[in-house]
Amino acid sequence: MSTIEERVKKIIVEQLGVKQEEVVNNASFVDDLGADSLDTVELVMALEEEFDTEIPDEEAEKITTVQAAIDFIQANQQ
């Protein structure tokens, strides 16, 4: 099974249509990877589905980088 980091990065590549090498931990979804607000909502939904978790809106707003997504998932896995 892949690590959480690998799974998060795979989802980001698929959702945003970016190259794997562009998805570095400190990359901002909007500033570095070209995501818009709809992309970020869809990305959060894909993360919720992949990791069978719920990301509250107030937390989703804080997930603006690849590392923030990884950190949230790691902190909220059962």
UniProtKB/Swiss-Prot annotation:
Boundaries of each Carrier domain copy? 2-77
Q: Which GO terms describe its molecular function?
A: acyl binding; acyl carrier activity
- InterPro entries (alphabetical): ACP, ACP-like_sf, PP-bd_ACP, Ppantetheine_attach_site
The answer to whether UniProt assigns keyword Ubl conjugation to this entry is no
> What keywords are assigned to this protein?
Cytoplasm, Fatty acid biosynthesis, Fatty acid metabolism, Lipid biosynthesis, Lipid metabolism, Phosphopantetheine, Phosphoprotein
* Single GO BP term: lipid A biosynthetic process
Could you confirm whether the keyword Lipid biosynthesis appears in this record? yes
Q: How is it modified after translation?
A: 4'-phosphopantetheine is transferred from CoA to a specific serine of apo-ACP by AcpS. This modification is essential for activity because fatty acids are bound in thioester linkage to the sulfhydryl of the prosthetic group.
**A GO CC term?**
membrane
The protein's annotated pathway: Lipid metabolism; fatty acid biosynthesis
Listed Pfam families: PP-binding (PF00550)
Compartments it resides in: Cytoplasm
Q: Which residues carry this modification: O-(pantetheine 4'-phosphoryl)serine?
A: 37
Q: Which PROSITE patterns does this UniProt record tie to the protein?
A: CARRIER, PHOSPHOPANTETHEINE
Query: What functional role does this protein have?
Result: Carrier of the growing fatty acid chain in fatty acid biosynthesis.
> What family is this protein classified in?
Belongs to the acyl carrier protein (ACP) family.
The protein here is known as: Acyl carrier protein
Q: Which organism is it from?
A: Pectobacterium atrosepticum (strain SCRI 1043 / ATCC BAA-672) (Erwinia carotovora subsp. atroseptica)
Which gene name does the record give?
A: acpP
